[in-house]
UniProtKB/Swiss-Prot annotation:
It catalyses: N-acetyl-alpha-D-glucosamine 1-phosphate = N-acetyl-D-glucosamine 6-phosphate. Its EC number is 5.4.2.3. The modification Phosphothreonine is found at T49. The active site is at S51. It comes from Schizosaccharomyces pombe (strain 972 / ATCC 24843) (Fission yeast). This is Phosphoacetylglucosamine mutase 1. One of its GO terms (cellular component) is cytosol. Mg(2+) binds at S51, D267, D269, D271. It is an enzyme of class 5 (isomerase). Pathway: Nucleotide-sugar biosynthesis; UDP-N-acetyl-alpha-D-glucosamine biosynthesis; N-acetyl-alpha-D-glucosamine 1-phosphate from alpha-D-glucosamine 6-phosphate (route I): step 2/2.
Length: 518
């Protein structure tokens, strides 16, 4: 099946040059059909996208029946299918993974605006036809929208949804209706009444235009970088990854940014969100995933206390979360847990809480409400007072507004702005809730990355022997010092992260830890 190309299915599915992706797309179609059969005909999603990658890349990922990421045991099956050396081996694997059933497999398809996406989607359909699968093609759609639709279909009892699939208008109506119910009094004199959003010239442009039209009476959303026809513009000098990495606005906004106006950038498939602004002195301020997480959980904490509900509420972070954000959460009395890097780890840990919040610093994240929390909000076990009833209603609205399947830049945008208005925070007030510790991230080339083994959510090394003790001794010399070393998952490098009370100290600590690694 494959020639001189090795595929590996990870958190983002398969991702590589679009010209090398055919075998991965075909085998993913087979895997999606097999997974649907294993789940007795539940609907599975297949999304063709490479998110924030350059336009010449593409990818394919499978969305499981709960609307979340593919079950881990199926990641290996996808990898085996994509790397099958012959048709005979491919057919053998299909027989191995096949669950005998009379249920027809069901799949829904979506793709981003890359020029290679429609061609790859057609190949996917050929495969699904060969697997005798029923499928619905949603065309150009954001990754979080497809996750949301899979979850809705499999939770629904509506026959039309199961047979024809819900119209995408369900997504827009659900989000904007919930947004309008969140503290309507704030809409009379909102602190944030306008936001400018950089769409990365990606597939999120049209959905955001639709949302902007539906919420225009309470929020003005101005869109920039919306050209999806000129494919070379995708993620080029724009988008959440560019802004986060460069610590500067998209190139199209250079010199045009107005002081204290709130701006946001999404990525190419609209699952990441970053905010930013410039102050009166034209200094750039980034409001990343840590800042989004702390704002959301801070307000949800207020609502939980007002509601009288005994909900557990917590935030999930990785080692890359800025230490100042962790300290801020601890000062609020909010439980914070750490996991290894990767959305699948964060998502799993967030599900342990009644209300679990997770955001990577890159702006990918969401808020998960447990089934128990949703049941208690719908049917309180006590007679709530007017104040409690209002808080319960607000929490219900957030559980609907925020995508429960996966991180969603569009729903996160609306949720964050509603929180800023509820707290009466403008961009500056939000930024000043805590000051990020200066930090530096570096890469060190090594001959064998596998010897670097970590524990404590990748924050401490257990191998090579004695290296962690040397790092500890260095860190102890710096005020608010912290550093960790983590092996890359894809290349022979280790990543070194360091933070301290000043930029000079953070840079110096990072350099000294890099020297230890060498």
């Amino acid at each position: 099946m494959t020639k001189n190309k090795k595929y590996s299915y990870g958190t983002a599915g398969f991702r590589t040059k679009a010209s090398d992706l055919e075998a991965a797309v075909y085998s993913s179609g087979v895997a999606a059909a097999l997974r649907s059969m294993e789940l007795k005909g539940k609907t599975i999603g297949v999304m063709i996208t490479a998110s924030h990658n350059p336009v010449e890349d593409n990818g394919v990922k499978i969305i499981d029946a709960d609307g979340g990421m593919l079950a881990m045991e199926w990641e290996d099956k996808c990898t085996q299918l994509a790397n099958a050396p012959s048709k005979a081996e491919f057919d053998f694997l299909i027989k191995q993974f096949l669950t005998p059933t009379t249920c027809q497999p069901k799949v829904i398809i979506g793709y981003d605006t890359r020029p290679s996406s429609p061609r790859l989607a057609e190949l996917l359909k050929v495969c699904l036809d060969e697997m005798s699968a029923s499928y619905i093609d949603y065309g150009y759609i954001t990754t979080p929208q497809l996750h949301w639709l899979v979850r809705l279909i499999n939770k629904s009892t509506a026959a039309s949804f199961l047979e024809e699939g819900p119209p995408i208008t369900e997504y827009y109506d659900t989000l904007t209706s919930a947004f309008s119910k969140i503290d309507p009094s704030m809409q009379d004199s909102p602190t944030v009444s306008r936001v400018v959003v950089d769409c990365a010239n990606g597939v999120g442009s049209q959905p955001l235009k639709t949302v902007a039209g539906l919420v225009k009476d309470s929020l003005s959303i101005e869109l920039v970088n919306t050209d999806v026809r000129a494919s070379e513009l995708l993620n080029n000098g724009c988008g959440a990854d560019f802004v986060k990495t460069k610590q500067s606005p998209p190139l199209a906004l250079e010199g045009k940014i107005k002081p204290n106006q709130l701006y946001a950038s999404i990525d190419g498939d609209a699952d990441r969100l970053i905010f930013y602004y410039i102050n009166q002195n034209r200094k750039f301020h980034l409001l990343d995933g840590d800042k989004i997480s702390t704002a959301l959980v801070g307000y949800l904490n207020i609502l939980v206390k007002k509601s009288g509900m005994p909900f557990s509420l917590g935030v999930v972070q990785t080692a890359y979360a800025n230490g100042a954000s962790t300290e801020y959460l601890q000062d609020l009395g909010i439980t914070t847990v750490f996991t290894p890097t990767g959305v699948k780890h964060l998502h799993k840990a967030a599900k342990e809480f009644d209300i679990g919040v997770y955001f990577e610093a890159n702006g990918h994240g969401t808020v998960l409400f447990s089934d128990k929390a949703l049941a208690n909000l719908a049917h309180p076990f006590f007679t709530p007072s007017p104040v409690q009833a209002a808080a319960i209603e607000q929490l219900q609205s957030y559980s609907v507004l925020i995508n429960q399947a996966i991180g969603d830049a569009i729903s996160d945008l609306l949720a964050t702005i509603s929180v800023l208005n509820a707290l009466h925070w403008d961009a500056s007030a939000w930024s000043n809730t805590y000051k990020d510790l200066p930090n530096k991230l570096a890469k060190v080339k090594v001959s064998d990355r596998t010897i670097y083994k970590s524990t404590d959510a990748e924050r401490r090394l257990v191998s090579p022997d004695g290296l962690q003790e040397k790092i500890d001794a260095l860190v102890a010399k710096y005020e608010k010092g912290r550093s960790f070393v983590r092996a890359s998952g894809t290349e022979d490098v280790v990543r070194v992260y360091a933070e301290a009370s000043t930029k000079q100290a953070a840079d110096e600590l990072c350099e000294k830890v890099c020297q230890l690694v060498l």
